[in-house]
């Protein structure tokens, strides 16, 4: 059983997870996740965000525990570096620049591009191999390598389709989501008030634009993956002292087991009274602080 800790509503509030988009930009399919509105901005129900985040974290934990591969995807500017940082920390995979059409559904072509990238790197690192090339040709090869790295650096060791897709901003990453749906790859995603949660197996209602929010999500995702990796390596008898040093290699070398797709969670039920009180008190405290600042 997972030992993923419960998500703290105050932590979500401090990171601005509750701020949705302007009410005029909402997607009605997100109605059940919206607490209300303030100053023409939708406020996300963090009681549901906290509960559904725990469910999503458990899905990540179980996937990695069973030797599965998790692919993190967010190509928006404010998330790009953060998603790469935390995916690398937990030994998983990522796409943080342009999503190339067919990255999942046309893997043969993508694998060919990865092979091309590997060959370019080997050539450019070998002084003898560069003999006979002009400066312009070497410069062209370097540019091609950098262009390929932007798209492929985070998946170059991904030898097959992932077992779980984790997305921040479902609107921007709709192509990745559509490809995952076609291949029956379960999806964890942060869904803002302008998002469509229909194809998301593990939705997390939350702000998908704030850097603080994005960093919080990624930290929680990475922690869950690392806990799953720890359990996987314990079961395999791997020296835990060497875990962080060999995180990526340990994941790549293991056989992949398919995580069965869980049922969709459209709305959490029976949120306990303590959680209700915590959320409402936190919102009230925020309002009081705002009024004090404006006094």
From Swiss-Prot:
Look up keyword rRNA-binding and say if it applies.
no
Keywords from UniProt, A to Z, are: Ribonucleoprotein, Ribosomal protein
UniProt xrefs under InterPro entries: Ribosomal_uS2, Ribosomal_uS2_bac/mit/plastid, Ribosomal_uS2_CS, Ribosomal_uS2_flav_dom_sf
Q: Does the keyword Acyltransferase apply?
A: no
Q: Which PROSITE patterns match?
A: RIBOSOMAL_S2_1, RIBOSOMAL_S2_2
Q: Which GO terms describe its cellular component?
A: small ribosomal subunit
Note the Gene3D superfamilies from the entry.
Glucose-6-phosphate isomerase like protein, domain 1, Helix hairpin bin
GO BP annotations listed: translation
Q: Which family does it belong to?
A: Belongs to the universal ribosomal protein uS2 family.
What protein name applies here? Small ribosomal subunit protein uS2
Organism encoding this protein: Rickettsia akari (strain Hartford)
Q: What is the lineage of its organism?
A: Bacteria, Pseudomonadati, Pseudomonadota, Alphaproteobacteria, Rickettsiales
């Amino acid at each position: 059983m997972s030992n993923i800790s419960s998500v703290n509503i105050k932590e979500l509030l401090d990171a601005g997870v509750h701020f949705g988009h302007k009410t005029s930009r909402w997607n009605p399919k997100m109605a059940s996740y919206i607490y209300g509105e303030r100053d023409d901005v939708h406020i996300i129900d963090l009681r549901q965000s906290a509960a559904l985040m725990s469910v999503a974290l458990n899905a990540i934990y179980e996937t990695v525990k069973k030797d599965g591969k998790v692919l993190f995807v967010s190509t928006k500017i404010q998330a790009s570096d953060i998603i790469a940082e935390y995916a690398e920390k937990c030994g998983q995979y990522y796409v943080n620049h342009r999503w190339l059409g067919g990255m999942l559904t046309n893997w043969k072509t993508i694998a060919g591009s990865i092979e091309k990238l590997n060959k370019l790197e080997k050539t450019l690192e070998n002084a003898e191999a560069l003999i006979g090339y002009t400066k312009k040709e070497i410069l062209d090869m370097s540019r091609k390598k950098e262009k390929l790295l932007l798209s492929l650096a985070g998946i170059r060791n991904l030898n097959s389709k992932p077992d779980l897709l984790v997305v921040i901003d479902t609107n921007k990453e709709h192509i990745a989501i559509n490809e995952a749906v076609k291949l029956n790859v379960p999806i964890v995603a942060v869904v803002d008030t302008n998002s469509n949660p229909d194809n998301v197996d593990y939705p997390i209602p939350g702000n998908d634009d704030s850097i603080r929010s994005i960093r919080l999500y990624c930290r929680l995702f990475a922690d869950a993956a690392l806990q799953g990796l720890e359990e996987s390596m314990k079961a395999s008898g791997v020296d835990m002292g060497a875990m962080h040093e060999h995180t990526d290699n340990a994941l790549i070398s293991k056989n992949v087991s398919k995580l069965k797709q869980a049922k969709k969670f459209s709305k959490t039920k029976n949120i306990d009274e303590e959680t209700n009180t915590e959320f409402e008190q936190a919102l009230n405290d925020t309002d009081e602080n705002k009024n004090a600042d404006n006094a």
